[in-house]
Regions:
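Start-transfer (signal-anchor) and selected internal transmembrane alpha helices
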Residues: 1-32, 126, 130-133
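Helix-to-loop transition at the C-terminal end of transmembrane segments
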Residues: 22-41, 55-64
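Transmembrane-helix motifs of polytopic, lipid-linked glycan transferases
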Residues: 99, 120-136
Length: 136
């Protein structure tokens, strides 16, 4: 591998790392008014905690979640059977799954009491998945 190719790889990794940390910093400082998982993103993301945290593919658990802080509603529709239907497809959740599972394992190992699918490690994994696919 020649020197220029190595330099490009390091520059790319540096820019990707800066992008991740700046995004996380802006969410933490309140520059963005909401958490990374909100509004439409919440609808795409909810398949992951439904399957891996709550073991509830019928999404009954959404009735116990706090309201979306962005004020967005209309993501879920209760059915006569008692199940809840998410109007968003699961393609985004499938792409986010490796990052979510890593966050879930880290949370279970170090902070099992906050393994709810929405705590800080899950939020950071959501940022990481967005940055990863942006640079891909």
């Amino acid at each position: 591998m020649d020197l220029y190719k190595k330099a490009y790889i390091w520059v790319f990794l540096l820019i990707a790392g800066i992008t991740f940390f700046m995004t996380a910093f802006f969410y933490k400082t309140g520059f963005f008014p909401y958490t990374p998982i909100h509004s439409d993103g919440n609808g795409y993301y909810l398949y992951l905690p439904a399957w891996f945290v709550y073991h509830d593919p019928g999404m009954h658990f959404v009735q116990n979640l706090p309201p979306d802080p962005s004020g967005f509603s209309g993501t879920f529709f209760p059915m006569p059977t008692g199940q809840v239907v998410d109007k968003y497809t699961m393609g985004v959740a499938i792409l986010q799954m490796p990052f979510f599972l890593l966050a879930h394992v880290i949370t279970l190992l170090f902070c099992p009491e906050i393994a709810d699918g929405f705590s800080i490690f899950y939020q950071l994994s959501n940022i990481a998945s967005g940055c990863f696919y942006y640079f891909l």
